[in-house]
Swiss-Prot record:
SUPFAM superfamilies to which the protein is assigned, alphabetical: Anticodon-binding domain of a subclass of class I aminoacyl-tRNA synthetases (SSF47323), Nucleotidylyl transferase (SSF52374)
HAMAP family: Cys_tRNA_synth
Amino acids binding ATP: 286
UniProt motif ('HIGH' region) ranges: 33-43
GO CC, alphabetical: cytosol
Quaternary structure (record): Monomer.
Positions that bind Zn(2+): 31, 226, 251, 255
Keywords per UniProt: Aminoacyl-tRNA synthetase, ATP-binding, Cytoplasm, Ligase, Metal-binding, Nucleotide-binding, Protein biosynthesis, Zinc
Protein name (record): Cysteine--tRNA ligase
Motif ('KMSKS' region): 283-287
Assigned EC number: 6.1.1.16
GO process annotations (BP): cysteinyl-tRNA aminoacylation
Major subcellular location class: cytoplasm
Amino acid sequence: MEHQLTIYNTLDRKKELFVPLHAPHVGMYVCGPTVYGDAHLGHARPAITFDVLFRYLTRLGYKVRYVRNITDVGHLEHDADEGEDKIAKKARLEQLEPMEVVQYYLNRYHKAMEALNVLPPSIEPHASGHIIEQIELVKKILDAGYAYESQGSVYFDVAKYNKDYHYGKLSGRNLDDVLNTTRELDGQEEKHNPADFALWKRAQPEHIMRWPSPWGDGFPGWHAECTAMGRKYLGEHFDIHGGGMDLIFPHHECEIAQSVASQGDDMVHYWMHNNMITINGTKMGKSLGNFITLDEFFSGSHKLLTQAYSPMTIRFFILQAHYRSPVDFSNEALQAAEKGLSRLMEAVDSLEKITPAATSNVDVKSLRTKCFEAMNDDLNTPIVISHLFDGAKMINNIIAGNNTISADDLKDLKEVFHTFCFDILGLKEEIGSSDGREAAYGKVVDMLLEQRVKAKANKDWATSDLIRNELTALGFEIKDTKDGFEWKLNK
């Protein structure tokens, strides 16, 4: 491949050269949402992070099979295998079938992802559609001796596994630390050890979501689905497993244990994790009740928001930080992102207004190289954006007459902005920006301003001023140029 991509491997705690197991094919699995409520900003971050990785790997010429699961069963209220299934609880409270809840919120999740310009994955498997595969996984772990049946449930034997392997190698924990921080909970007596986790849970009589198994009616533990579905669609060994850093422990740690216990080694080569979205330094999440949904951002309807923010503003806001750095929500930060995005999109639009010269005194090749170098450095999107802002300055200087650019360089500059702004970062021009009026009024405004140019040429200053004043009153900003005019609709 032309470019040498390095990515930070959480397992080894360092950046490593990305070398696919079966180039040019790449297998990538990312933990998707548990669909029992509307998607919030915390859901947008992993979706956008791994969308950029998907886009970039594709741009580098790899054939990527991107699997992002949907958790629609087995995710209990608490990680210690106690409490009610989150979706079943929502269904009970709303007096709906669990799959009605799943379908409703999944439709809304897809709509939000489409608004954010997140590409759909290659495969989007549901946990409830892979019960057979999860039962087979549990059988293999039982046969290997790393699990036990207890009162109709099956638990992973962490202590026994830890004698042969290292439980905690991903999160950097040892078993004593895990035991010291694991609470003894009521109803946990069937476990040998508080740190043991459920592979299969016995369904209580009132439990709606249940399937027959060799151990009786029940449902799979949360961790089983990703191991089973990753193996089914990507094989026993694949390249990348991603998710939020809050999944490192226990979810991804348990996935590694399940994989090793069932096949003798870890399925995953590179473990990647994005950092969290915070509000006043605290993780944003449904379980904490401090989240703002994406629809609330788009409409400005949450009490913490001073205005509405477009989907591309949200995307740009997230990409302005490196994916492994925390992002703290504030209206000020979002407004700054909105202005930055506007500057970038104006630069893209201005490219069409440039008349090439015979010679060039700008270095487009260097700009392109710097952008690729930043992406190859563990997807350093904030550095890419800073280079694109340098490109925007270049464009403004050319338009102002301070620099010149040849036709070939102009073509290359357009390609750089299109490749990085749209193809890789996944930004797009929003027809809905400024309430959609700019796109709707474009031809009319151009026609009026052309009449104004004619009026000025005829020294009809009254008509010229009337057109300008009326458009200004409607929110249009008019700028006279040597080639005629420019305009934009202010927010």
